[in-house]
């Protein structure tokens, strides 16, 4: 539906024109000090000595389109009052919802600001120190006291430790090079083995000596005979040495 457009009365036209004129005058008064278009009212009331003949400049007409002077009325959309009421109700509901959301956001922001203010109480000793860190530190766990061991267990452990740490004199003598009978016996055994090897070699060479002797007798060479005698003496000594141990030989010498 379209609302009927009626002509405004003369009294309304006059009141609107007077209010518009007052607004224009106020705007001009506010704009003249900045732009220098007109003089201030105080300056116009107090003219200088040489400016009596000068007149104030005439105000320029406004170029704005005045609503009251055009052909149509103020309702350009030509809406009905019912439609305007419906739109107003919708806008009111929208504004109420936005205001409620804004209040909730403000409450959350206030709570955050209060929390930050509580955390920032005091001062930071270092740049990396966390505010409120001393509150979050967990209390240390209580140390459990060990029960004192019984006397029998303690004595057994001490004896075992002493046995592990103790070293006998025989172990020290065995490891030392001076008092080591086992090593001396090993050396004697090695010497005996070396002598036996030499004796065996001499016995193996005995048939060869006999052949050389026979050859020397046949040839009648005195040098070969002397060599043969020396070899025989060495062979006899090597045979007598293993048969007679050194202790028995020493005991037999004074008897001879």
Swiss-Prot record:
It comes from the Eukaryota. GO terms for biological process: Wnt signaling pathway. It is found in: Nucleus envelope. Residues 63-83 have a biased composition (Basic and acidic residues). A motif (Nucleolar localization signal (NLS)) lies at residues 228-235. InterPro entries: CUSTOS. GO terms for cellular component: nuclear envelope. Keywords: Developmental protein, Nucleus, Phosphoprotein, Wnt signaling pathway. The modification Phosphothreonine is found at residue 80. Plays a role in the regulation of Wnt signaling pathway during early development. Belongs to the CUSTOS family. PANTHER family: CHROMOSOME 12 ORF 43 HOMOLOG, PROTEIN CUSTOS. This is Protein CUSTOS. It comes from Mus musculus (Mouse). The lineage of its organism: Eukaryota, Metazoa, Chordata, Craniata, Vertebrata.
């Amino acid at each position: 539906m379209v609302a009927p457009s009626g002509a405004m009365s003369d009294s309304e036209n006059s009141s609107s024109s007077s209010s518009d004129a007052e607004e224009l005058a106020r705007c001009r008064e506010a704009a003249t000090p900045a732009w220098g278009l007109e003089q201030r009212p105080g300056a116009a009331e107090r003219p200088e000595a040489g400016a009596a003949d000068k007149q104030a400049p005439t105000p320029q007409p406004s170029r704005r389109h005045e609503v009251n002077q055009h052909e149509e009325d103020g309702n350009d959309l030509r809406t009905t009052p019912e439609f305007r009421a419906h739109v107003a109700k919708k806008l009111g509901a929208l504004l109420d919802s936005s205001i409620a959301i804004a209040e909730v956001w403000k409450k959350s922001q206030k709570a955050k600001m209060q929390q930050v203010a509580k955390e920032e109480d005091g001062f930071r000793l270092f740049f990396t120190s966390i505010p409120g860190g001393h509150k979050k530190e967990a209390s240390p766990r209580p140390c459990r006291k060990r029960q004192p061991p019984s006397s029998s267990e303690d004595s057994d452990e001490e004896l075992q430790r002493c046995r592990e740490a103790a070293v006998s004199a025989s172990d020290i003598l065995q490891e030392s090079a001076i008092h080591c009978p086992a090593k001396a016996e090993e050396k004697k055994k090695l010497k005996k083995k070396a002598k036996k090897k030499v004796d065996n070699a001499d016995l193996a060479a005995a048939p060869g000596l006999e052949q050389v002797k026979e050859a020397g007798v046949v040839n009648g060479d005195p040098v070969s005979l002397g060599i043969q005698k020396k070899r025989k003496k060495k062979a006899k000594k090597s045979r007598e040495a293993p048969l007679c141990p050194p202790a028995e030989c020493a005991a037999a010498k004074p008897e001879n």
